[in-house]
Amino acid sequence: MNDRYELLAPIAEGGLGTVFRARDRQLGREVAVKRIRADKAQNVGSAVEALIRDARQQSAIQHPNIVAVLEAGVDEEGGYLVMELVQGETLEDRLGRAPLSGDEFDQLVRQVLAGMSAAHAAGIIHLDLKPENIMLTPRLGGGIHVKILDFGLARPVAPPDGEADIKRNSLHGSIHFMAPEQFERADVDERTDIYALGCLFYYALTHLHPFDGDTKPQVMVAHLYHRVNPLGKLRPDLPAHTVRWIEWLTSRHPAERPSSVAEALKVYENGVLS
């Protein structure tokens, strides 16, 4: 890898890897490179296998609102993943700096739903949708372009035999954006992502979590018992349809949520929720 990519500076660190800004010597462009950190991976071999598997999954999703995977491999230093370098800031950073305008929120919703619709159509669920995994890039002339990052916890909607049991018996994700069925070790599907999106959009409007607590167990209980901070009280200026739509996405039981991202987008656009 080092023959082609020159690591320039770290961009971010995760549980198992570090993401670097890098230069592609062959094409003369900047890219992002994720490296597995051997000092943080309990089983480096398994971590590398997971990285390559996740790269294959993400590369199957070709969409302008999902970060593109360019290359993945293994060298003498371990596993690596090369992605397009997205300029801009995360949704988390943006909300810490300034709230979204109404138009920006509308663009966020439409583009995130478009990207996740493509992912689900490819048979992939994300399972770690959160503000840190949403990049916003200013457009020339105004507006924002949205990119969804980090499919590191993603899995096929219909995983191979045995893999579903492994996923069910493990608990991964960001607790404020996890659906009740994840805490219950129950089956997950597209509607699990839809719940996370509802939490994400609520957060984008308030900079607060719909299900919260002083400790992680308290947050989990809030999800499980649906103890939600009413959006309408925090943002009485919002259209009633927007409030009801987000409440629909964050319904306690999967069967009560939209059956697909496409359905969620259609209802959002039509402004009618029966």
Question: What is each residue range found by the language model?
Answer:
Residues 42-45, 138-183:
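Activation segment of protein kinases
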Residues 108-109:
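Activation segment signature within eukaryotic-like protein kinase domains
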Residues 18:
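Conserved N-lobe ATP-binding subsite of Hanks-type protein kinase domains
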Residues 76-90, 94:
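Conserved short submotifs of the Hanks-type protein kinase catalytic core
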Residues 114-124:
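Protein kinase catalytic-loop region centered on the HRD/HxD motif
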Residues 37-60:
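AlphaC helix of the eukaryotic protein kinase fold
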Residues 72:
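Activation-segment/catalytic-loop signature of the eukaryotic protein kinase fold
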